[in-house]
């Protein structure tokens, strides 16, 4: 059973460098009032980048999950004032893999984990790649990994990151449609 609700109040209980924790009070249409906490996040982008032969990914440590070299799509936060989602995707592609793309297509926008955060992730397909040296961010420790597009199935078997799985499954769906 779904229920409409209104937010009565909300305040920040923790302010961090990357996220904030918000506590809010809500009244549902049946009159019940509930208190909820959630992680406030500025949103993110991820880029499925390929040149027709190679698929461009990154490996980086993710301390929160204990991963020393998590295989991921190039991605980043929407944390630059005034920057559009597409501008953020272009910036992240340059920063993380040193590429620019002639062609951009929005694939999906989804809620990353609606039970505890308001983060939405926007995934783009980037093709027509060319070199564009970006600038490395000192604490990211990124390793660029180019994989054969023909090995997409094997790559999917290695991936445990949600945004990367979503993006690569959407890519595989597109490639399968083209092949049919």
Region spans (language model):
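A generic structural signal for well-ordered coil/turn residues at beta-strand boundaries
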Residues: 15, 20, 43, 117-120, ...
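Active-site segment of metal-dependent pyrophosphate-handling enzymes
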Residues: 42, 62, 72, 94-131
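Nudix hydrolase/Nudix homology domain
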Residues: 2-5, 32, 69, 116-117, ...
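Conserved Nudix-box catalytic region and its N-terminal flanking loop in Nudix hydrolases
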Residues: 2, 45-91, 108, 133, ...
């Amino acid at each position: 059973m779904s229920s409409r609700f209104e937010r009565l109040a909300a305040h920040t209980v923790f302010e961090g460098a990357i996220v904030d924790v918000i506590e809010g009070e809500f009244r549902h249409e049946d009159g019940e009032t509930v208190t909820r906490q959630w992680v406030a996040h500025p949103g993110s982008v991820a880029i499925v980048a390929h040149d027709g032969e190679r698929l461009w990914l990154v490996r980086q440590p993710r301390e929160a999950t204990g991963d020393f070299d998590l295989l991921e799509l190039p991605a980043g936060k929407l944390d630059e004032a005034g920057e559009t989602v597409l501008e953020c995707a272009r910036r992240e592609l340059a920063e993380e893999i040193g590429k620019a793309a002639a062609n951009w297509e929005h694939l999906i926008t989804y809620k990353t984990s609606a039970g505890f955060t308001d983060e939405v992730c926007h995934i783009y397909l980037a093709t027509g790649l060319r070199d564009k040296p970006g600038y490395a961010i000192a604490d990211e420790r990124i390793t660029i990994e180019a994989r054969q597009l023909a090995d997409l199935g094997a790559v999917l078997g290695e991936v445990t990151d949600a945004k990367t799985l979503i993006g690569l499954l959407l890519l595989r769906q597109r490639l399968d449609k083209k092949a049919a």
